[in-house]
């Protein structure tokens, strides 16, 4: 079991903890598939809803909040039945807008894993307005069920009445809907090819600034992030922040980063290079490789 879970595992009911420990191996990064979840539910003699709430301390253990020191864990349940953990991330000494909220982390985890719809969000603190707006961008977002400890479950529409969302800006394919943009780039670099694929899967209906970041660590592992825009603009999730959230979920340190690549469309209304460099230079002595590509 990873050291970061030693304290949080003691907060779980013993039968659930015993069943969960084998999953918390060195490569565990917060994903539990539907079959594993069913086994946890059976072994613990709890309902699935009870298990998901009980797992929140494990999700919160993924957090990296050096500024607030407030650990928030979230779990996104996909339509597939799989669950995806996420946690808040703050960059030391950097502006607060670089922060990643736990709900964003969990949703991006699900998106990067191929989920096309989120049906439930479980979180240990009431979603802030920023996160409510972020969730409203999702496929059938208004009907996502929000679960909080010791509170009744409600749909997102309950938490965000009279919402402004993608439909108000004539966007018919919301975040997580299957869509892809093709780009032209001649490269044999596996890291750049990976970034190009993720840029094509990014979500930028408001600026057309499709983009992705790939981070490579000293052992050759790569961690990707995609741009995820929002109808309200400010709650948009930048690809560097998504990549850093991905990296920390995998229990890697910022000091492990040896290479960073940003790929973005030449036809976008904005560029993410400045914000991406700001975040990168805060946490790693690595120069950003910036590649601009043309859509097909």
Swiss-Prot record:
One of its GO terms (molecular function) is zinc ion binding. GO terms for cellular component: cytosol. Its cofactor is Zn(2+). GO terms for biological process: cytidine deamination. Binds 1 zinc ion. It is an enzyme of class 3 (hydrolase). Keywords: Hydrolase, Metal-binding, Zinc. Zn(2+) binds at residues 101, 128, 131. Substrate binds at residues 88-90. It catalyses: cytidine + H2O + H(+) = uridine + NH4(+); 2'-deoxycytidine + H2O + H(+) = 2'-deoxyuridine + NH4(+). InterPro entries: APOBEC/CMP_deaminase_Zn-bd (IPR016192), CMP_dCMP_dom (IPR002125), Cyd/dCyd_deaminase_Zn-bd (IPR013171), Cyt/Deoxycyt_deaminase (IPR050202), Cytidine_deaminase-like (IPR016193), Cytidine_deaminase_bacteria (IPR020797). Residues 47-167, 186-296 form the CMP/dCMP-type deaminase domain. Its EC number is 3.5.4.5. SUPFAM superfamilies: Cytidine deaminase-like. The active site is at 103 (proton donor). It comes from the Bacteria. Belongs to the cytidine and deoxycytidylate deaminase family. Homodimer. NCBIfam families: PRK09027.1. This enzyme scavenges exogenous and endogenous cytidine and 2'-deoxycytidine for UMP synthesis. This is Cytidine deaminase. It comes from Shewanella sp. (strain W3-18-1). The lineage of its organism: Bacteria, Pseudomonadati, Pseudomonadota, Gammaproteobacteria, Alteromonadales. The gene is cdd.
